[in-house]
Each structure stands twice: as structure tokens, then as C-alpha cells.
Amino acid sequence: MRIVTFFVIMVWMFTAAEITRGEEKGKMSQEIFLPSKGGDWKWDGKEMKYNSKALFGYMDGAAEFYLAYGFENLTVRRFEKSGGPPIVVELYEMASSEDAYGVFSFEHQDEDVGIGQGSEFGGGLLRFWKGKYFASIYAEGEGAEVESGILEMGRATANSIRSTGPEPKLAGFIPGKDFGLVDKSVRYLRSHVLLNQRFFIAHQNILNLSRRTEAVLAQYLRDKEKVQLLLIRYPDLKEAGDAYRNFMKVYLPEARGKDRSKTEDRKWTLARQRNEFVVILFGASAEADAEALLKATEEKLVARR
């Protein structure tokens, strides 16, 4: 039995990043068939697949980012055109549509181009999400019709994904543009490492973020200054309470039992727990503005429960 188990493990390890040929093996999952062409670009017949362990060999230093969002597997195809640069299609299968949205949201900055459930195209890179999939499509160089080729490849890839999926409900629990929400600033996060990359709080995970929690970070323009709103949902009331108390102890020790304090930059930080939610506002010059935004968030939480 041990010999059989060892054999199975060895086979699994050596096939983690396999290269297959032919359309009959072009299936990423039971419902996904990646395209064989896009515009004048045609698939070279090779398909590379990576699981969570093999992902580190494909992208040095970036694998942890996808793993934080529940990465399951990656399929990569290259498309070639005579006289033009190759176009690469990377299709990431995540644990859920919420995770795919999170990957997309993390670096969202360009205008939507109408592909998938959310997309952007800039600097020769097309990014979009649809269902539980996130796609990154780019050319390995410049040339005529490259941009149109990337967009055609994107539309074909999106059409191969039959199912859509919901955005994180938590993203709808924050105030909108009427309260100064900055366009394209909403980030859906599943780890404190990712949170720190967008807005540094502490080296330690003082808010106890994990795959069991959800967090939304967004920027608001208040009195011509940008403030950061962080909304976190925990699995239950106890975990929310533990995280809130730890945050107040470590980050706002000067609050002394209150829900707010000025930090070293002389700006206000406010934090409250509401049931399984923790709401924190960073960097407000005016206490009244911070209170208004925090209260608006609490009202959204009550309305959507």
C-alpha cells in the first residue's frame, strides 16, 4: 500500500506542470475550453498547467498573491502570428467568484473594456474576471494590431467561460460616490500581507485576517483629502470582538476605552465593532468627517442585514 501511495505521489508531482498538445487536451475544467485563435494569432498547440506548488516555478515572488485568494490552478497558452509578437493567455481558476473579483480589484486602475464581469486594458495588458476565473492577457513585444489582437483574444477567452458568479457582498456594504468614494479604489482582501501592500497597518496580523475573513479597503475624498475605510467581516461575533480589541490595544493604545484617537500624523483613526463586522477609518483630518463616514457605513450594514 505504501508503494502504491508513493507511486501516486510521484506521478502527481511530475505532472503538476504538464505540457499537452492538441485541441482534445485543451480543456481546463469540465466547462472551460480556451480558444485556439484570436484575430490573426493562432495557438501554438502547447498548453501549460500549474497547480499551487508548481506556480512558484512559473512566477517568482508572485505566487503568494494568488494563493491568498484561493488559487486552484493556472492554464497558459501562447498564440503566434507571422511578423508579430506572441500573445500569452493566463487563465487562473480561483476558489470562488469572490476570489476572482479580489484578484482583479487589487490592481484595478484602468477603464473597463466590456469583457467578462469586470475588465481593464492599459499598457498592453488586459485583465478581467468572470465567474471563478481571472485572466491576464498580454503580448511579448510590440507590433501592428497587437492591441486589437489582445482584445479579441480576451473576448474569446471570456466567451469560453460559461458561468458568471457574484461579486463579494461585502463590497456593497460601504458608502458610495455620494460620500466621496474614489473610483476604482475598492480592494477586496483576504490576507493582512495584501492589506499592508495597499495600506500598511502593522507587520503583525493584528486584525487576524485569514481565508475565513473578508475585508474591503476603499479610498474616500473628504475635504480634499483621501481617507482609507476598512471594513472586515469575521466568521462570528467572538472573532470580531477579539480582533477589534487587539487592534485597539496595539494600534490605538491612546484611545483609552474610546473608539478613536489621533495618531502620530495628527490625523484621526476611528474604529468600531458592529456584530461580526469591524469598521476602521484612517487618516481623517476632521473628526466630524470621519464620524459621518463611519456612521454611513454602519447604516449600510444595518440596511443590508
Region locations from a protein language model:
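Soluble, non-membrane globular domain cores that form compact, hydrophobic packing
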Residues: 5-8, 12-305
